[in-house]
Amino acid sequence: MKALLDLFKQVQQEEVFDAIKIGLASPDKIRSWSFGEVKKPETINYRTFKPERDGLFCAKIFGPIKDYECLCGKYKRLKHRGVICEKCGVEVTLAKVRRERMGHIELASPVAHIWFLKSLPSRLGMVLDMTLRDIERVLYFEAYVVIEPGMTPLKARQIMTEEDYYNKVEEYGDEFRAEMGAEGVRELLRAINIDEQVETLRTELKNTGSEAKIKKYAKRLKVLEAFQRSGIKPEWMILEVLPVLPPELRPLVPLDGGRFATSDLNDLYRRVINRNNRLKRLLELKAPEIIVRNEKRMLQEAVDSLLDNGRRGKAMTGANKRPLKSLADMIKGKGGRFRQNLLGKRVDYSGRSVIVVGPTLKLHQCGLPKLMALELFKPFIFNKLEVMGVATTIKAAKKEVENQTPVVWDILEEVIREHPVMLNRAPTLHRLGIQAFEPVLIEGKAIQLHPLVCAAFNADFDGDQMAVHVPLSLEAQMEARTLMLASNNVLFPANGDPSIVPSQDIVLGLYYATREAINAKGEGLSFTGVSEVIRAYENKEVELASRVNVRITEMVRNEDTSEGAPQFVPKISLYATTVGRAILSEILPHGLPFSVLNKPLKKKEISRLINTAFRKCGLRATVVFADQLMQSGFRLATRAGISICVDDMLVPPQKETIVGDAAKKVKEYDRQYMSGLVTAQERYNNVVDIWSATSEAVGKAMMEQLSTEPVTDRDGNETRQESFNSIYMMADSGARGSAVQIRQLAGMRGLMAKPDGSIIETPITANFREGLNVLQYFISTHGARKGLADTALKTANSGYLTRRLVDVTQDLVVVEDDCGTSNGVAMKALVEGGEVVEALRDRILGRVAVADVVNPETQETLYESGTLLDETAVEEIERLGIDEVRVRTPLTCETRYGLCAACYGRDLGRGSLVNVGEAVGVIAAQSIGEPGTQLTMRTFHIGGAASRAAVASSVEAKSNGIVRFTATMRYVTNAKGEQIVISRSGEALITDDIGRERERHKIPYGATLLQLDGAAIKAGTQLATWDPMTRPIITEYGGTVKFENVEEGVTVAKQIDDVTGLSTLVVIDVKRRGSQASKSVRPQVKLLDANGEEVKIPGTEHAVQIGFQVGALITVKDGQQVQVGEVLARIPTEAQKTRDITGGLPRVAELFEARSPKDAGILAEVTGTTSFGKDTKGKQRLVITDLEGNQHEFLIAKEKQVLVHDAQVVNKGEMIVDGPADPHDILRLQGIEALSRYIVDEVQDVYRLQGVKINDKHIEVIVRQMLRRVQITDNGDTRFIPGEQVERSDMLDENDRMIAEDKRPASYDNVLLGITKASLSTDSFISAASFQETTRVLTEAAIMGKRDDLRGLKENVIVGRLIPAGTGLAFHKARKAKEMSDRERFDQIAAEEAFDFGTPSTPAEEPQHPAAE
């Protein structure tokens, strides 16, 4: 019977498993895996090429070389299967068992596993409570360790040198035992009673108060508990048996010329075997201790380098002096097993070729070269040939195909029909980088690509290549067609904008056709329909741009929605339009009014047009419409015949004067600087400002001249119209080029940046049309080269950011429809510097409302909570002027191990509520990572031209209304009657008649207010002005100045300007001060009143003291009288550097890595009143007294700037010391919502600067993953340790269990982890190991006996299952359901049988799914 079963066993059923467990293998386990001991270091006989017996390739141990044939050839063929040859000892079976059968080496002396010794923190050290240094000395035979102290004063685990040992032996005789090497360590490990240790540690933890001890104990406890829980014995960290890898996994290949190519592992194994055998012999011979010891040490080193070469000491090298690749090197890094073979496999049935444009294709088609298709679809063709009877065998079919007979081409046509192929362009930065198309066979060897999908692929036709993949199975074809077909992916998943937007020629053609010209041929004619217009145009009676009146038929949605009524009805109206627009109206889809076309179609307009079409007419109509737009665009661009020549670049005549005036101004500043009125820094700042303004002015003059041209209208009057200049039209339509580039062609090139980002103050006044002289050319290349160097570096950085983001979010999938939470965040319009940066409608579009949205005027509910807010809803909300809406967010979703659809909202790439199974984590990571790469590739396009925003120096109202100040605004009135702001965080609001906020502006410290609270103002009124170049220090009190600690050469330096000879006092940096004493003092001013008394702060006993920070230029003299609101010192703002995403990418990375900034600002820990305590050396003491009267002290370095003053009320989480915010503090003091707002806004700032749109929810998804661990503060009755970080879902599950059992649940704090940390601390060890620090992750997992439940996508890809997302999620759900029902049926049958036989019923044994090892 068994033989019969074996016969069927040939086809191996794939294993079904739900989890993978990792652990340490006991020596017995290793022996049980093994098929025999490898005793000799020999590999194969160089003459016969047969493996040596008992060697590393022994056929007896590892299996036969050829299928079903023993080594000596006595037994051949299938019939002897399973026989063991008595002559050579080889089992007759498949040769591929050589890939799976392991051997082993019995070590003559135990050896420590280097991973558990050297991978930090050393696990051996933790278990034994010894330092790594000591253990190493014992293992490598430099010292003895006491095993049993006996009755001596020695302690167990004490280290002693050899001399020590011999002295002690003389002293105590054999009263005690000490050992050397791994044997000693193994005995120590065996002696440990884990349960006892855990108990003592837990009591110690409770009783100790010192932080350091708690940390140490908790760490050790964690390791010991892991051993306790997993049932792994610590002594298994010492190897007695070494497993040997199957030979096919470390092959030895004969090359021609009698040489062999071999895997490094064979060398490493050979060394181990050689040393092991020598040691065995020495032990048999009873060699002297010192020789044996040396041999044992060498064996330990050999095993070390086999496991992880180079981890300790020098790496073992081969004959060619390069380090050998050990087992650890095989799995880690980019070329290791995980990333090279498991996550990135090469794919069969694929090809690649250059792409060319295919303007005749439909959106869902691509042109596939015939030869390529023939190769890719070979198996299908063979099959068809056999079915049709053209060929009888595969071999014959192959010949047919190779000869390319006519019948083959017919079959190819047939096979390809309705069989989509996938096109991919590297780098695939987001999911639109792979799309499916229906192939159309073409001649030639290049793939044809539809022009509209280029934006999604980021492809152009300058030699890009693309890869083609064939989905083979029916399911794969179905998924490719329904989910990946190009016509189903018309929106960007990052922001929901259309991805099939026309560009370049198409835009130019459409723009040219929809422009209007004054007094063109046939102006003012009237037509009865579009066909008449076309006839007139073809007979050259009218031009495209002529203004005419046309009757146009629009198809509008039918009001009557009863059965049988048509969906659209025609509506005829007379429009004043142009010929071109009328002709275009032919392709308008049903349901769109003509008004959307009745304007010049620029790129933005076309994008909006396609968006509108998608929302109003659905996917199909949009795709058809986009295709027709493209066809028309190409045709019209050809008709337009636009070309450019040098004369199109018109240089403005007023350029000379503008540049001349600027030069004069610069001279004036130089003069002021010479006479000492301004500092060098201010002069530089001003000069740069003048030149950027000049550059703007020249650009403006040039644009004015370029953008209009004189024309005579029908009545003979001179007028101007928008220009038909080719260059202007290209830029204006958005087809190619930008205003900045035109300015460089015909205006002036302007300021250039040095590679370090600082601006060269000499601008390039010439433009490319006039030509540059040598100096100008040199300056321009200087900055431009940086762009090229940047690109290479940043692409790598951006790719790494994307990789970390994907890794942290890869297991986040939508798993249910609604988690039922009532939490959410309040969304407001994002206002910065008075500008609405992002309107409320954009922020809430596609989100689910969490509270009812109420009409503020009638108080009726507009949208109930749980409504998905779509375009119509957000427009309505905007129209009613609702300020804030509470919406669901991924951050507050209560789903465990995933997200729910309601908290996520709309799937931006599809335009409807997200489906269960969507891998929203990966999409978020792609959406954030993709523009990073895009932008880095774009830094150099403007050729390094300085794009420095002129600094704001005033703020004006954008709308009419009433000025309101926030509660934080404080100001004083100075002697001139001006109001000077002295608050740091004051804001001015403009409200409308009903009191709704229209805009808000931050008013900086030291600004002069021009409007006061309650003033009614008109749009354009200035609210406040300030000096943008310096930051003042202002006194709130009047009096006589008395300097303290202002000593020249100690705290301040006299700066004498080399040019002007004038001096100012500058506060010097603490680090540059000489003596220790001067480091702790802070230069400051006290004020004296008329009686010479110190001026006190009203209501307190504290004297007024105003400190100067580093870099301040002191403008008052000692003993000078000052009035309220006067400036005591100025702090120059730093020289501006140009910002591009170069600063941006690292900024995004540090936000997601949750790094604490270097000089972080300090936030108030409690709400209360501030006061200053006694200063200590180098620090000032700030005390906050909370509402209960408890005092909280902060010690603040003297040079830091304190934002609060005496007796000010601060709120918890408010910034009290200036500096960048620390996200960890925000989370601790202000909670998750504030943290999320901070990270989202900061990340968005970086991208917005580059004009990149990313939806907030993607960033929120990442933040959710950064918050997925919690720190246990009180463990209650749970299995956690206080201070331990655990997965939030785990903790909630455990707490639920505790509550169900009436025990105490654990309490916890939220922890913010950076993305790298979060990826490594995930519960899945497979995912973490394939990300970074493979050794450390695997070491830790093995000790803890970790179990990976294969929840994420990455783990499943690695073990080769369908991923639990999309269609795979449904598959896994169905599989689990089937298992459950099978188990129930099994129980039922068992119960019935038990009942039938009248046996006492016992619960049937459940078939468990063992976790795969």
UniProtKB/Swiss-Prot annotation:
Mg(2+) binds at residues 460, 462, 464. SUPFAM superfamilies: beta and beta-prime subunits of DNA dependent RNA-polymerase. GO terms for biological process: DNA-templated transcription. It comes from the Bacteria. Its cofactor is Mg(2+); Zn(2+). Zn(2+) 1 binds at residues 70, 72, 85, 88. The RNAP catalytic core consists of 2 alpha, 1 beta, 1 beta' and 1 omega subunit. When a sigma factor is associated with the core the holoenzyme is formed, which can initiate transcription. DNA-dependent RNA polymerase catalyzes the transcription of DNA into RNA using the four ribonucleoside triphosphates as substrates. This is DNA-directed RNA polymerase subunit beta'. The gene is rpoC.
